A protein has these predicted regions:
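Short amphipathic alpha-helical surface micro-motifs
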Residues: 1-3, 76-78, 151-153
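Active-site HxH/HxHxD metal-binding segment of metal-dependent hydrolases
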Residues: 14-15, 29, 36-112, 129
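Metallo-beta-lactamase
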Residues: 118-159
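Conserved beta-strand hairpin/beta-sheet module of binuclear metal-dependent hydrolase folds
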Residues: 1-49, 123-134, 140
Length: 159
């Protein structure tokens, strides 16, 4: 396997995680929901990685807070939910349900999962047996329903 998935445990009041996928041969990386840029920058510098993509699951500040600084430091493409473009001005690659895109030779599938927010998306990578689901699903349950309905969240969790 040419990839390594890293979990950055962010020590803030919301106890966020930042996921980073490293492509070992190229030393390129993608970061998912970078709440704080400094954690990402420090990790990339310590491991000689170049950040090339940012993937966002939804518009909440604890998932997009580090994007402006990372955009200043790296030449990155920013992927995120088309339905939340008005709330996430950084997105230059808007995504919608059942769309796919690439990171190196990985195929990333996008699923819309409204409930936590109306435009929430998740990233499914079959080759890594991984689902990056933002605030849709937690180890002890699902995320809070802020914008959507409980029916939408139920449908999203069943996808």
């Amino acid at each position: 396997m040419d990839y390594k998935v890293h979990l950055l445990d962010i020590h803030n009041p919301l106890q966020n995680y930042i996921w980073l996928i490293e492509h070992l041969p190229s030393q390129q990386a993608v970061v998912i929901d970078p709440t704080e840029a400094q954690y990402v920058t420090d990790f990339c510098q310590a491991h000689n990685l170049t950040l090339t993509q940012i993937w966002l699951t939804h518009w909440h500040k604890d998932h997009i807070g580090g994007v402006p600084q990372l955009m200043q430091q790296y030449q990155v493409k920013v992927y995120g939910p088309r339905k939340e473009l008005s709330k996430i001005p950084y997105i230059d690659h808007p995504l919608q349900d059942e769309q796919s895109f690439q990171f190196q030779d990985l195929n990333i599938e996008v699923l819309e999962v409204p409930g936590h927010t109306l435009g929430h998306i998740v990233y499914l990578i079959q080759d890594l047996h991984s689902l990056f689901c933002g605030d849709t699903l937690f180890a002890m349950g699902c995320g809070r329903v802020f914008e959507g309905t409980f029916e939408q969240m139920y449908h999203s969790l069943n996808r």
